[in-house]
Protein backbone atom coordinates (compact mmCIF):
# COMPACT_ATOMS: atom_id res chain seq x y z
CA UNK A 1 0.00 0.00 0.00
CA UNK A 2 1.34 3.44 -0.94
CA UNK A 3 2.20 5.78 1.94
CA UNK A 4 0.07 8.82 1.23
CA UNK A 5 2.33 10.96 3.39
CA UNK A 6 5.13 10.47 0.88
CA UNK A 7 3.17 11.73 -2.11
CA UNK A 8 4.16 15.09 -3.52
CA UNK A 9 1.38 17.67 -3.73
CA UNK A 10 1.34 20.77 -5.91
CA UNK A 11 -0.87 23.72 -4.99
CA UNK A 12 -2.32 26.28 -7.37
CA UNK A 13 -2.24 29.97 -6.66
CA UNK A 14 -5.58 31.36 -5.42
CA UNK A 15 -8.09 31.70 -8.26
CA UNK A 16 -11.80 32.59 -8.52
CA UNK A 17 -13.96 29.80 -7.11
CA UNK A 18 -16.12 27.97 -9.65
CA UNK A 19 -18.96 27.49 -7.15
CA UNK A 20 -19.06 30.48 -4.79
CA UNK A 21 -18.76 33.82 -6.56
CA UNK A 22 -17.40 35.80 -3.63
CA UNK A 23 -14.48 33.49 -2.83
CA UNK A 24 -11.10 32.41 -4.09
CA UNK A 25 -10.06 28.78 -4.30
CA UNK A 26 -6.81 26.86 -3.98
CA UNK A 27 -6.46 23.32 -5.31
CA UNK A 28 -3.79 20.71 -4.56
CA UNK A 29 -2.87 18.10 -7.16
CA UNK A 30 -1.11 14.78 -6.78
CA UNK A 31 2.28 14.75 -8.50
CA UNK A 32 1.45 13.83 -12.13
CA UNK A 33 4.60 11.69 -12.26
CA UNK A 34 3.20 9.30 -9.64
CA UNK A 35 2.15 5.92 -11.01
CA UNK A 36 -1.53 5.58 -10.14
CA UNK A 37 -3.40 2.28 -9.93
CA UNK A 38 -6.79 1.31 -8.54
CA UNK A 39 -5.39 0.77 -5.03
CA UNK A 40 -3.83 4.23 -4.77
CA UNK A 41 -6.79 5.91 -6.44
CA UNK A 42 -9.14 4.22 -3.97
CA UNK A 43 -7.04 5.39 -1.03
CA UNK A 44 -7.00 8.95 -2.31
CA UNK A 45 -10.73 8.97 -2.94
CA UNK A 46 -11.26 7.78 0.61
CA UNK A 47 -9.34 10.87 1.74
CA UNK A 48 -11.46 13.28 -0.24
CA UNK A 49 -9.63 13.49 -3.56
CA UNK A 50 -11.35 13.58 -6.96
CA UNK A 51 -10.33 12.97 -10.56
CA UNK A 52 -10.54 15.22 -13.58
CA UNK A 53 -8.99 13.48 -16.55
CA UNK A 54 -5.60 12.20 -15.45
CA UNK A 55 -5.34 14.73 -12.62
CA UNK A 56 -6.23 13.88 -9.01
CA UNK A 57 -7.01 16.87 -6.83
CA UNK A 58 -8.57 18.19 -3.64
CA UNK A 59 -9.61 21.69 -2.51
CA UNK A 60 -7.17 23.28 -0.06
CA UNK A 61 -8.59 26.74 0.50
CA UNK A 62 -7.11 28.63 3.45
CA UNK A 63 -10.20 30.64 4.36
CA UNK A 64 -13.00 28.31 3.25
CA UNK A 65 -14.04 24.73 4.01
CA UNK A 66 -17.27 24.69 2.00
CA UNK A 67 -16.32 21.74 -0.24
CA UNK A 68 -16.99 18.61 1.80
CA UNK A 69 -16.46 15.12 0.32
CA UNK A 70 -19.67 13.09 0.34
CA UNK A 71 -20.49 9.44 -0.24
CA UNK A 72 -23.64 7.31 -0.10
CA UNK A 73 -23.70 4.05 1.87
CA UNK A 74 -25.46 1.82 -0.65
CA UNK A 75 -26.05 -0.95 1.89
CA UNK A 76 -28.44 1.24 3.87
CA UNK A 77 -29.64 3.62 1.14
CA UNK A 78 -33.40 3.98 0.79
CA UNK A 79 -34.86 6.11 -2.03
CA UNK A 80 -37.23 8.84 -0.92
CA UNK A 81 -40.61 9.39 -2.57
CA UNK A 82 -39.26 11.74 -5.19
CA UNK A 83 -36.50 9.30 -6.10
CA UNK A 84 -39.01 6.45 -6.27
CA UNK A 85 -41.07 8.50 -8.72
CA UNK A 86 -37.95 9.08 -10.78
CA UNK A 87 -37.32 5.34 -10.94
CA UNK A 88 -40.90 4.66 -12.05
CA UNK A 89 -40.71 7.41 -14.63
CA UNK A 90 -37.66 5.77 -16.18
CA UNK A 91 -38.61 2.11 -15.90
CA UNK A 92 -38.64 1.91 -19.70
CA UNK A 93 -34.92 2.63 -19.88
CA UNK A 94 -32.23 0.01 -20.36
CA UNK A 95 -28.99 0.50 -18.42
CA UNK A 96 -25.85 -1.05 -19.89
CA UNK A 97 -22.29 -0.81 -18.54
CA UNK A 98 -19.74 -0.32 -21.33
CA UNK A 99 -15.97 0.19 -21.43
CA UNK A 100 -15.75 3.00 -23.97
CA UNK A 101 -17.80 5.94 -25.19
CA UNK A 102 -15.37 7.15 -27.84
CA UNK A 103 -18.00 7.01 -30.58
CA UNK A 104 -19.82 9.61 -32.65
CA UNK A 105 -23.10 8.69 -30.96
CA UNK A 106 -21.79 9.35 -27.46
CA UNK A 107 -19.86 12.48 -28.36
CA UNK A 108 -22.85 13.99 -30.17
CA UNK A 109 -24.94 13.59 -27.01
CA UNK A 110 -22.16 15.07 -24.87
CA UNK A 111 -21.74 18.07 -27.18
CA UNK A 112 -25.48 18.69 -27.20
CA UNK A 113 -25.54 18.57 -23.41
CA UNK A 114 -22.64 21.02 -23.01
CA UNK A 115 -24.05 23.43 -25.60
CA UNK A 116 -27.51 23.47 -24.03
CA UNK A 117 -26.74 23.13 -20.32
CA UNK A 118 -23.23 24.49 -19.76
CA UNK A 119 -22.55 27.14 -22.38
CA UNK A 120 -21.15 29.37 -19.61
CA UNK A 121 -18.73 26.74 -18.29
CA UNK A 122 -15.12 25.73 -18.83
CA UNK A 123 -16.02 22.87 -21.17
CA UNK A 124 -17.77 25.13 -23.70
CA UNK A 125 -17.41 24.92 -26.60
CA UNK A 126 -17.19 21.11 -26.55
CA UNK A 127 -14.10 19.56 -28.14
CA UNK A 128 -13.63 15.87 -28.82
CA UNK A 129 -10.05 15.67 -27.55
CA UNK A 130 -11.09 17.30 -24.26
CA UNK A 131 -14.05 14.93 -24.08
CA UNK A 132 -11.70 11.95 -24.29
CA UNK A 133 -9.14 13.24 -21.81
CA UNK A 134 -11.62 14.56 -19.24
CA UNK A 135 -13.85 11.51 -18.91
CA UNK A 136 -11.38 8.62 -18.95
CA UNK A 137 -8.60 7.62 -16.56
CA UNK A 138 -5.25 6.32 -17.76
CA UNK A 139 -5.22 3.65 -15.07
CA UNK A 140 -8.22 1.86 -16.58
CA UNK A 141 -10.87 1.93 -13.88
CA UNK A 142 -13.53 3.91 -15.74
CA UNK A 143 -16.85 2.44 -16.84
CA UNK A 144 -19.84 4.08 -18.49
CA UNK A 145 -23.50 3.48 -17.74
CA UNK A 146 -25.57 3.99 -20.89
CA UNK A 147 -29.25 4.87 -20.67
CA UNK A 148 -31.29 3.92 -23.72
CA UNK A 149 -35.02 4.24 -24.31
CA UNK A 150 -37.37 1.66 -25.81
CA UNK A 151 -36.29 2.73 -29.30
CA UNK A 152 -32.64 2.07 -28.36
CA UNK A 153 -31.81 5.76 -28.58
CA UNK A 154 -28.99 6.89 -26.31
CA UNK A 155 -30.35 9.55 -23.94
CA UNK A 156 -27.82 9.57 -21.11
CA UNK A 157 -24.42 8.45 -19.86
CA UNK A 158 -23.03 8.25 -16.33
CA UNK A 159 -19.23 8.11 -16.07
CA UNK A 160 -18.02 6.16 -13.02
CA UNK A 161 -14.66 4.96 -11.73
CA UNK A 162 -14.45 1.57 -10.04
CA UNK A 163 -12.78 1.65 -6.62
CA UNK A 164 -11.83 -1.06 -4.15
CA UNK A 165 -14.76 -0.21 -1.88
CA UNK A 166 -17.21 1.40 -4.26
CA UNK A 167 -17.50 3.65 -7.27
CA UNK A 168 -16.78 7.31 -7.84
CA UNK A 169 -19.37 9.22 -9.85
CA UNK A 170 -17.27 11.31 -12.24
CA UNK A 171 -19.72 12.99 -14.62
CA UNK A 172 -23.16 12.62 -16.17
CA UNK A 173 -24.49 13.98 -19.45
CA UNK A 174 -27.87 13.47 -21.05
CA UNK A 175 -30.32 14.67 -23.69
CA UNK A 176 -31.55 18.13 -22.60
CA UNK A 177 -34.86 17.41 -24.35
CA UNK A 178 -35.57 14.67 -21.78
CA UNK A 179 -35.89 17.11 -18.89
CA UNK A 180 -39.07 15.49 -17.52
CA UNK A 181 -37.18 12.28 -16.80
CA UNK A 182 -34.87 13.91 -14.19
CA UNK A 183 -31.95 12.01 -15.68
CA UNK A 184 -29.41 13.57 -13.32
CA UNK A 185 -31.26 12.02 -10.38
CA UNK A 186 -31.75 8.77 -12.25
CA UNK A 187 -28.03 8.55 -13.02
CA UNK A 188 -27.15 8.65 -9.32
CA UNK A 189 -29.79 6.03 -8.53
CA UNK A 190 -28.49 3.82 -11.34
CA UNK A 191 -24.95 4.06 -10.00
CA UNK A 192 -26.16 3.17 -6.51
CA UNK A 193 -27.94 0.11 -7.93
CA UNK A 194 -24.84 -0.86 -9.91
CA UNK A 195 -22.70 -0.59 -6.77
CA UNK A 196 -25.18 -2.76 -4.88
CA UNK A 197 -25.07 -5.45 -7.57
CA UNK A 198 -21.27 -5.49 -7.34
CA UNK A 199 -21.40 -5.72 -3.53
CA UNK A 200 -19.67 -2.35 -3.27
CA UNK A 201 -20.19 -0.28 -0.15
CA UNK A 202 -20.13 3.33 -1.33
CA UNK A 203 -20.90 5.70 -4.17
CA UNK A 204 -18.69 8.78 -3.94
CA UNK A 205 -20.48 11.89 -5.22
CA UNK A 206 -17.63 14.37 -5.08
CA UNK A 207 -18.08 17.51 -3.01
CA UNK A 208 -21.15 18.77 -1.22
CA UNK A 209 -21.39 22.55 -1.06
CA UNK A 210 -24.29 23.71 1.07
CA UNK A 211 -24.34 27.24 -0.35
CA UNK A 212 -24.21 26.12 -3.99
CA UNK A 213 -27.56 24.94 -5.32
CA UNK A 214 -26.12 22.79 -8.09
CA UNK A 215 -24.02 20.89 -5.52
CA UNK A 216 -26.34 20.85 -2.51
CA UNK A 217 -28.67 18.16 -3.94
CA UNK A 218 -26.23 15.42 -2.96
CA UNK A 219 -27.52 15.17 0.61
CA UNK A 220 -30.89 13.97 -0.74
CA UNK A 221 -29.44 10.45 -1.09
CA UNK A 222 -29.68 9.12 2.45
CA UNK A 223 -28.03 8.02 4.56
CA UNK A 224 -24.88 9.79 3.43
CA UNK A 225 -21.45 10.34 4.92
CA UNK A 226 -19.37 13.53 4.99
CA UNK A 227 -15.59 13.64 5.32
CA UNK A 228 -15.01 16.12 8.14
CA UNK A 229 -11.76 16.52 10.09
CA UNK A 230 -10.28 13.51 8.29
CA UNK A 231 -13.06 11.11 9.22
CA UNK A 232 -16.29 9.98 7.61
CA UNK A 233 -19.37 10.92 9.63
CA UNK A 234 -22.82 9.43 8.97
CA UNK A 235 -25.92 11.59 8.52
CA UNK A 236 -29.37 10.03 8.35
Curated annotation (Swiss-Prot):
InterPro entries in the cross-refs: Acyl_CoA_acyltransferase, Asp_Glu_LeuTrfase, N-end_Aminoacyl_Trfase, N-end_Aminoacyl_Trfase_C, N-end_Aminoacyl_Trfase_N
Annotated family: Belongs to the R-transferase family. Bpt subfamily.
Keywords, sorted A to Z: Acyltransferase, Cytoplasm, Transferase
Function: Functions in the N-end rule pathway of protein degradation where it conjugates Leu from its aminoacyl-tRNA to the N-termini of proteins containing an N-terminal aspartate or glutamate.
EC number: 2.3.2.29
Sample GO molecular function, one term: leucyl-tRNA--protein transferase activity
One Pfam family cited in the UniProt record for this chain: ATE_N
Entry GO CC: cytoplasm
GO biological process, one term: ubiquitin-dependent protein catabolic process via the N-end rule pathway
Enzyme class: transferase
HAMAP family: Bpt
Catalytic activity field: N-terminal L-glutamyl-[protein] + L-leucyl-tRNA(Leu) = N-terminal L-leucyl-L-glutamyl-[protein] + tRNA(Leu) + H(+); N-terminal L-aspartyl-[protein] + L-leucyl-tRNA(Leu) = N-terminal L-leucyl-L-aspartyl-[protein] + tRNA(Leu) + H(+)
Organism of derivation: Saccharophagus degradans (strain 2-40 / ATCC 43961 / DSM 17024)
UniProt subcellular location: Cytoplasm
Official protein name in the record: Aspartate/glutamate leucyltransferase
Predominant localisation class: cytoplasm
UniProt-listed SUPFAM superfamilies: Acyl-CoA N-acyltransferases (Nat)
Amino acid sequence: MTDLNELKLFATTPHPCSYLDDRDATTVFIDPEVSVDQNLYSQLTNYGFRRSGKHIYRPACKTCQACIPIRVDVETFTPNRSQQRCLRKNKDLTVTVVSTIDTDEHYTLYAKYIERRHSDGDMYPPKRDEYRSFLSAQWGVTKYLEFRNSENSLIGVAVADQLKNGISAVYTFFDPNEQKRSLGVYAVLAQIEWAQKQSNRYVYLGYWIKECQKMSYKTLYKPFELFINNQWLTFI
